[in-house]
Amino acid sequence: MSDSEDSNFSEEEDSERSSEAEEAEVEEDQRSAAGSEKEEEPEEEEEEEEEYDEEEEEEDDDRPPKKPRHGGFILDEADVDDEYEDEDQWEDGAEDILEKEEIEASNIDNVVLDEDRSGARRLQNLWRDQREEELGEYYMKKYAKSSVGETVYGGSDELSDDITQQQLLPGVKDPNLWTVKCKIGEERATAISLMRKFIAYQFTDTPLQIKSVVAPEHVKGYIYVEAYKQTHVKQAIEGVGNLRLGYWNQQMVPIKEMTDVLKVVKEVANLKPKSWVRLKRGIYKDDIAQVDYVEPSQNTISLKMIPRIDYDRIKARMSLKDWFAKRKKFKRPPQRLFDAEKIRSLGGDVASDGDFLIFEGNRYSRKGFLFKSFAMSAVITEGVKPTLSELEKFEDQPEGIDLEVVTESTGKEREHNFQPGDNVEVCEGELINLQGKVLSVDGNKITIMPKHEDLKDMLEFPAQELRKYFKMGDHVKVIAGRFEGDTGLIVRVEENFVILFSDLTMHELKVLPRDLQLCSETASGVDVGGQHEWGELVQLDPRTVGVIVRLERETFQVLNMHGKVVTVRHQAVTQKKDNRFAVALDSDQNNIHVKDIVKVIDGPHSGREGEIRHLYRSFAFLHCKKLVENGGMFVCKARHLVLAGGSKPRDVTNLTVGGFTPMSPRISSPMHPSAEGQHGGFGSPGGMSRGRGRRDNELIGQTVRISQGPYKGYIGVVKDATESTARVELHSTCQTISVDRQRLTTVDSQRPGGMTSTYGRTPMYGSQTPMYGSGSRTPMYGSQTPLQDGSRTPHYGSQTPLHDGSRTPAQSGAWDPNNPNTPSRAEEEYEYAFDDEPTPSPQAYGGTPNPQTPGYPDPSSPQVNPQYNPQTPGTPAMYNTDQFSPYAAPSPQGSYQPSPSPQSYHQVAPSPAGYQNTHSPASYHPTPSPMAYQASPSPSPVGYSPMTPGAPSPGGYNPHTPGSGIEQNSSDWVTTDIQVKVRDTYLDTQIVGQTGVIRSVTGGMCSVYLKDSEKVVSISSEHLEPITPTKNNKVKVILGEDREATGVLLSIDGEDGIIRMDLEDQQIKILNLRFLGKLLEA
C-alpha cells in the first residue's frame, strides 16, 4: 500500500469521527447509514494489509513499520518471530484458548472506544450550542464539588480528624524549630525571659524575629525556638545567661519530627489490686502503699498504707496548749499503726463503722492501717519495688505476701534480670516446679536446659513463667535493692526470700531471690560512686568521726567514736580523715600507731585483741577477726589498750629509768638515785665509755625497749650497735630502725648504766641512824595528829613536794595517772568514774627508788617467801648482807607477815614519805626488789606497828580492829573471777554496795561486772572488798602460798575454813577466811 493510500485512510477515519460528532441528534436512519459505512471499513483494511505485506516482502523498508492503531487501552502481545514457532508441539486446544482471549480483548477495546466517541460528541455539542456562562457553570460543578475525600468517604462531614488536620502540618515554607541547649532546671524560666525580651524589642529598630519558644516538661536541658533562620535564633538568645551553653550550636529539627515536640502521650498504668505504689507529695511523700481498688471513672485510687498520726498535736489540742501547738513548726510524724486506745487516752474521738474505725474523717482497719483515696496523679506507679523491711511492715509474716504482684505498664513486658547460667524454676503452666539452667536470653524469651531424666532438649519459656532458685551454700551477689553490690554465702532459703551472710560486713541479709545472681568474686567494699569504702574513717560533724561498717545503696551505716551505729546518707558524710601518722599512748605509756596489734584490758571490750585501723584523739578503732558485729570493727579508749610486744607493767625487779629526760633539776642532780644511771650512757657501767666508732658486740642480740621518740615503748632485738646508735628490729612491726643508744633500755637489766645505788640504806655512813630525811626519827612526824594515815586530810601528798610524787611536772609527764600533775585530764575524757585515782602506772615514782631498811644487793632471782634471820638495827653497815629483820625501825614502808596466824599478819610503819610497801622477803609480792613498788594507793588506815627503832618482840603484834578484813593498802589479794562488793568510799553512790565479779586486773585497777547494773566498770582495788564465802561455796585462795588455787569450802571453824582443794590429790587444808574469795558459780 502506497503512502497516498495510507494518508487517504487516515483522512477518511478523521472525517468519519467528525461526522459522528456533528450528527449526534439525527434520526436513526442516518445512524444506521453510518453503521453500514463502519461495516465496510474492516473489509477495506484487510485488503490493504494483505497488499502491504506482499510489498514488504519484495522491498527493503528502510524506515520502521508503523504501529497498528488500537482503540483500547490494552496492547496486544508482541508477535513471536517465525523462526521460533513450534506449532507442532502445542497441545490440542491451545489455539482455541488463544482465539477466545483475542476475541474478548477485541470486545473490550470496542466498548472503551464507544465510550470515548460518545463523550467527544457530547463535548462538541456543548461547545457549539451553549454559551460561555453556561460552560463556566458546567466546569465549576464538575470540578469544584468533587474531591478525594468525598470520593473515598462520601462527604465532608465524614472526613476523619487526621485528614482534616493535614493542612495544619508544617511544611517547607513554615518556620523551623531549633534546639538550644539550656541550663538544666531553668527551661521554663528561660522561655519566659525570651518572651519578655521579645516584647521589649517589639517596637524597636531591631525586633526579634523568632516566632515562639517551646519548653516541654519532659525535655531537660533544652528548649525549642521557632524561627526562619539560625541567625534569628542567635540574635534572640544573645545575652541570655541560661542559654550561653547553646549560643554557638543550634540544631534544626526535621520537618517530620516537629509535630512530635508538642505531642503528649501519657501511658495509663494498668493498676491491679495488691500492687504497690508510692505517694508523690504531702505528708505521705515517698511512702509505700498497696492498691485496694481503682475507680477509673473518677480517676481515683484507694490505697492501704501505714498512717502518720501526730499524737503530740492531738495531746496539745486537747489541752490549754492548743494555741502554742498551732504556732509550732510543722513536723512530719513517724509511721505508726493506728492505736485506738492511745487516741482515746489522749482525748480523741474514735468511732466504729463496721470493720473500720473512723478518726478525723479517715478510715482505719482493725490492724491499724489507713485506707484513703487519692487522685491517680498523686501516686507513682512505674518502677515501684518495695523493700523487704517495708513488706514486713504490711504483714506480720512476709511469707504471706505475694511478692510477684508488680505494676505493669500498658504494652510493656515485665522487666526481668535472667542471665545465662542462672538456675531457674518453672512457676506457672504444665511444667511447674521443673528446674533448669538458663542457656540464652532473647528479650522476654528464656531458653533453658531442664534438669530432668526424660527431658534432654532445650525448652523455651516466657520470663514471667520462671523464677530464680538457690540452694544453701551458693555464693551470690546482690544486683538490686537496698544491699546492691554486696556478696555473701546463702545460709537459709525460704519461700519468698533468701538469707545470706555478707562477706564484707559479716551480717545476715534478707534479699528477694530475683535480686540475686550467682557469682564467684567478693564485693570490693566500695560504694556506687567510688568515693567511700568499707572501714574508712569519715567525719560526721565537726566533733564526731566514725568508721563505715556497712555500704548500702543510698545510705551508710557508720560506727561512731562513741560506739553507736548510725545510719547516714551519702551526702551527710563530709570528708575522709587521714590518720596514717596518728600516735596515741596506751595504758603503759607506749606509743601506738595504725596497724599495731593491741589487746584491750579495760572497758566493755576487755579481753579482745585486734589491729588498730584508725586513731582519732583518745579513741582507737580496732578490727578483730573473731568479732561478728559490725564486720569486726569496734572502738575503745586508747588508755584501755596494751601494745602487743610492747613493754609490760614494770615489776619490782625493774629499776629501768634509762633514756628518761628529767623534768625537774632535782632529779638530774648527781645525788638523786634516778640520775646515776644516766651519766655513764647506755651499757657503760660506772660512767666508763667504751670508745668511739667501735661496734658494741655485747649489746648485739639483746632485747631492748625504746624509751623516747616516735617509737617509745616498742620492744625489739639489737642487730647492730655502735657507741652512739643501734639498729633495732621491732617485734610488733618487724622492721629495723636506727635509734640513739641513749633512748634504749635493756628489758632484763636493772639499770641502763652505772652501779646500783646505796642511797637511802640504813644503817649508813658508819652505822648512822637515823639517815638524813629518812623519817626514822623518834618521835615520828613530830606529834602528828591524827596518827593513822587514813584519817589525815589531805591524805595524799601532805608534803610539797612529797619526794618525787607530788612534784609538777612529774617524771612521767602530764599524762602519768600515778602523779597528781597539773594540768590533769578533763573529767569528760574518762568513760567510767575512777574516784580520785586513775589507772596506776606500772612504776611508782612517788617513793624512794631504793629500800631504806635494810640494805642488800640486788638479787638475781628473788624468791616469793625466802627464809630470813632477824638482825638488830645496830648491826654496822649492812651493805652486803642477805639477811634482814622484819621488825626494823619505822620506815616509809611496811611489810606483810609471811605466814597466816591468828594475830595480825601486817607489820607496817606509816610514814608521810611514801605509801609503798617495804619490799623485803617477807612481802607477799611475788618478785621482791630493792625498788619501791606502789601497788595501790589507798586512803584506808594502815596496820599498827611500833613507833620506836627498837625491835618489838615476836608476840608484840597489835591486833586489827575486829571486822577490818583484809588490809586494803595493797592490791595483792585482787584476782579474777571472785565476787567483790563496792565499798562506801567510792564516789559513785549509785553503785556503792553492789556486788560484782572481777573480770580482769591491771595494776591496782579492776574491771568489775556489776550484776544489778549489768555493766562493766573500772574501779580501784581500794574501793573493793571480797565477799566472805559460806559453807559449800566454791572458793579461791587470794593470799598466801596457795594463792590462785581453788576448792570447796566444806565447813567454817571460827575464823578458819576447811577447804577441799581442786588439785589431783584433793587434799584438805585449813586457811583463814580472809585468805579466801568467793568464786562466781556457773
From Swiss-Prot:
It comes from the Eukaryota. Its main location: nucleus. Disulfide bonds: none annotated. Methylated by PRMT1/HRMT1L2 and PRMT5/SKB1. Methylation negatively regulates interaction with P-TEFb and RNA polymerase II. Phosphorylated by CDK7 and CDK9. Phosphorylation by P-TEFb (CDK9) at Thr residues of the C-terminal repeats alleviates transcriptional pausing and promotes transcription elongation. Dephosphorylated by the INTAC complex when transcripts are unfavorably configured for transcriptional elongation, leading to premature transcription termination: dephosphorylation is mediated by the PPP2CA component of the INTAC complex. Dephosphorylated by the PNUTS-PP1 complex in termination zones downstream of poly(A) sites, thereby promoting deceleration of RNA polymerase II transcription. Residues 311-418 are annotated as: Interaction with RNA polymerase II. The modification Phosphoserine is found at residues 32, 36, 664, 684, 783, 798. GO terms for cellular component: DSIF complex. Residues 678-690 have a biased composition (Gly residues). Residues 174-268 are annotated as: Interaction with SUPT4H1 and SUPT4H2. Signal peptide: none annotated. A motif (UBR5-degron) lies at residues 326-332. CTR repeats lie at residues 748-753, 754-759, 760-765, 766-772, 775-781, 782-788, 790-796, 797-803, 805-811, 838-845, 848-856, 857-863, 875-879, 890-896, 898-905, 910-915, 918-924, 926-933, 937-944. Keywords: Acetylation, Activator, Isopeptide bond, Methylation, Nucleus, Phosphoprotein, Repeat, Repressor, Transcription, Transcription regulation, Ubl conjugation. RNA binds at residue 577. DNA binds at residue 617. Transmembrane segments: none annotated. The modification Symmetric dimethylarginine is found at residue 692. One of its GO terms (molecular function) is chromatin binding. Pfam families: KOW, KOW1_SPT5, KOW2_Spt5, KOW4_SPT5, KOW5_SPT5, KOW6_SPT5, KOW7_SPT5, KOWx_SPT5. There is a cross-link at residues 141, 1031 (Glycyl lysine isopeptide (Lys-Gly) (interchain with G-Cter in SUMO2)). Component of the DRB sensitivity-inducing factor complex (DSIF complex), which regulates mRNA processing and transcription elongation by RNA polymerase II. DSIF positively regulates mRNA capping by stimulating the mRNA guanylyltransferase activity of RNGTT/CAP1A. DSIF also acts cooperatively with the negative elongation factor complex (NELF complex) to enhance transcriptional pausing at sites proximal to the promoter. Transcriptional pausing may facilitate the assembly of an elongation competent RNA polymerase II complex. Interacts with SUPT4H1 to form DSIF. DSIF interacts with the positive transcription elongation factor b complex (P-TEFb complex), which is composed of CDK9 and cyclin-T (CCNT1 or CCNT2). DSIF interacts with RNA polymerase II, and this interaction is reduced by phosphorylation of the C-terminal domain (CTD) of POLR2A by P-TEFb. DSIF also interacts with the NELF complex, which is composed of NELFA, NELFB, NELFD and NELFE, and this interaction occurs following prior binding of DSIF to RNA polymerase II. Belongs to the SPT5 family. This is Transcription elongation factor SPT5. The lineage of its organism: Eukaryota, Metazoa, Chordata, Craniata, Vertebrata.
